[in-house]
Amino acid sequence: AFVGCGGADCGICGRDSLIESGLDLLQLVDLGYGACKFIEAEPSWRAGQAERNYARRGSLRVATKYPRIASAWYASRGVVADIVSLHGNIELGPIVGMTDRIVDITATGATLRENDLVITGEIMECTARFFVNPGAARLDPRVRILGERLAAAVEHLHFEPVAGSAQ
């Protein structure tokens, strides 16, 4: 929000946060670390129930803390989804029967396994990004130079994936 509203010229955060913010920001460099995947998941013991609920209700109920990304993904697939915005422990949505599925990020899959959830769809991969305010990119050469230097540094680095991570 600081960068999008002009309080800062540039920043670093995950691709997921940039997309979900909906702000007009320029992603200049994929920093290549902090890898995770955006996934759709459901309880393993309720396999097929979401499709039956969709046929009966005409919509899929989905818990997420990323409503913009989830809505866009379902819309791109022609699926009507009722998005339930939750903050923290979204995996409980389908476990307690409040939703059919979840959309969330995962790096190792540990939380999914702990809650007996299985991946039913992969939405996108995310890594940390260097991003800038478009106005700052046009007006301040230091912002562009910083982006160029980061891009050059990333080319020479090699991040080893953490065991069990999304990479």
Protein language model regions, located:
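Domain-level signature for soluble enzymes in the chorismate/prephenate branch of the shikimate pathway
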Residues: 1-167
